[in-house]
């Protein structure tokens, strides 16, 4: 990459922080991206959106969005940037809004006949016995609009259900209950039109929760994931299909479970995944020879789509 290419990106705002429940992770991601772009010669500036008025972003030529959670990953900041005429990285308004809503994402995936675990919305008035009868136990209870596994819990007995629902409801009015898939956890990163190598996650914590993602030293990551060539091709294609059906674009991540019979099940999509030293997209990129600085540069380059009027 030449200095002329870096200069052509103009003044770049690396958006981070914000005021969501994932603020601290976003600050770490954003700082890492900012430093990578600066090393590449990009005129980047770190911008905490909780401390800067949106109108001030008109002074930038483009934005690298490293915000996680509400206000950053749900289409809100994307819509604001479009109104301001500032090109940005990643998915557009629609893709982000859908991707942030686990319930509606799964409705779309089911409509496209993609493999999704059985599930239902869990409300205070929901008939618990009917839910368990139709979906089964164990269950995974989760807020419909939070990331980083915030508010999630595994329920193995009927008497645990209400406490798990109440905890998830602290973060969201919509609470999702879906069948727990016993098996291996996998994730596939998307970069442009390409699915990167799958990663298999191994944690002693029962599932890949917030602690396992960001704090635990016990989580193990396997890339290559130990799949056959056909299985690797299958999970990558499934990730691309799920990403496109949800209206996502640019870059992101799709999470899976693989059951004991070898079937892959879609869990959720991440339109702005973490970019910390524990993060999965940089790990998958390294597996194909793309270092962190190059990864950030490629994601930034993708913002040119919006200058051409493409979603």
Curated annotation (Swiss-Prot):
<protein>
    <recommendedName>
        <fullName>D-alanine--D-alanine ligase</fullName>
        <ecNumber>6.3.2.4</ecNumber>
    </recommendedName>
</protein>
<feature type="domain" description="ATP-grasp">
    <location>
        <begin position="106"/>
        <end position="301"/>
    </location>
</feature>
<dbReference type="GO" id="GO:0008360">
    <property type="term" value="P:regulation of cell shape"/>
</dbReference>
<dbReference type="GO" id="GO:0046872">
    <property type="term" value="F:metal ion binding"/>
</dbReference>
<keyword id="KW-0464">Manganese</keyword>
<keyword id="KW-0479">Metal-binding</keyword>
<keyword id="KW-0547">Nucleotide-binding</keyword>
<keyword id="KW-0961">Cell wall biogenesis/degradation</keyword>
<feature type="binding site">
    <location>
        <position position="268"/>
    </location>
    <ligand>
        <name>Mg(2+) 1</name>
    </ligand>
</feature>
<dbReference type="GO" id="GO:0009252">
    <property type="term" value="P:peptidoglycan biosynthetic process"/>
</dbReference>
<feature type="binding site">
    <location>
        <position position="268"/>
    </location>
    <ligand>
        <name>Mg(2+) 2</name>
    </ligand>
</feature>
<comment type="pathway">
    <text>Cell wall biogenesis; peptidoglycan biosynthesis.</text>
</comment>
<feature type="binding site">
    <location>
        <begin position="132"/>
        <end position="187"/>
    </location>
    <ligand>
        <name>ATP</name>
    </ligand>
</feature>
<feature type="binding site">
    <location>
        <position position="255"/>
    </location>
    <ligand>
        <name>Mg(2+) 1</name>
    </ligand>
</feature>
<keyword id="KW-0573">Peptidoglycan synthesis</keyword>
<dbReference type="InterPro" id="IPR011095">
    <property type="entry name" value="Dala_Dala_lig_C"/>
</dbReference>
<dbReference type="InterPro" id="IPR011761">
    <property type="entry name" value="ATP-grasp"/>
</dbReference>
<keyword id="KW-0133">Cell shape</keyword>
<keyword id="KW-0436">Ligase</keyword>
<keyword id="KW-0067">ATP-binding</keyword>
<dbReference type="GO" id="GO:0008716">
    <property type="term" value="F:D-alanine-D-alanine ligase activity"/>
</dbReference>
<dbReference type="GO" id="GO:0071555">
    <property type="term" value="P:cell wall organization"/>
</dbReference>
<comment type="function">
    <text>Cell wall formation.</text>
</comment>
<dbReference type="GO" id="GO:0005829">
    <property type="term" value="C:cytosol"/>
</dbReference>
<dbReference type="GO" id="GO:0005524">
    <property type="term" value="F:ATP binding"/>
</dbReference>
<dbReference type="InterPro" id="IPR016185">
    <property type="entry name" value="PreATP-grasp_dom_sf"/>
</dbReference>
<keyword id="KW-0460">Magnesium</keyword>
<feature type="binding site">
    <location>
        <position position="270"/>
    </location>
    <ligand>
        <name>Mg(2+) 2</name>
    </ligand>
</feature>
<dbReference type="Pfam" id="PF01820">
    <property type="entry name" value="Dala_Dala_lig_N"/>
</dbReference>
<dbReference type="Pfam" id="PF07478">
    <property type="entry name" value="Dala_Dala_lig_C"/>
</dbReference>
<dbReference type="InterPro" id="IPR000291">
    <property type="entry name" value="D-Ala_lig_Van_CS"/>
</dbReference>
<keyword id="KW-0963">Cytoplasm</keyword>
<dbReference type="InterPro" id="IPR011127">
    <property type="entry name" value="Dala_Dala_lig_N"/>
</dbReference>
<dbReference type="InterPro" id="IPR013815">
    <property type="entry name" value="ATP_grasp_subdomain_1"/>
</dbReference>
<comment type="similarity">
    <text>Belongs to the D-alanine--D-alanine ligase family.</text>
</comment>
<dbReference type="InterPro" id="IPR005905">
    <property type="entry name" value="D_ala_D_ala"/>
</dbReference>
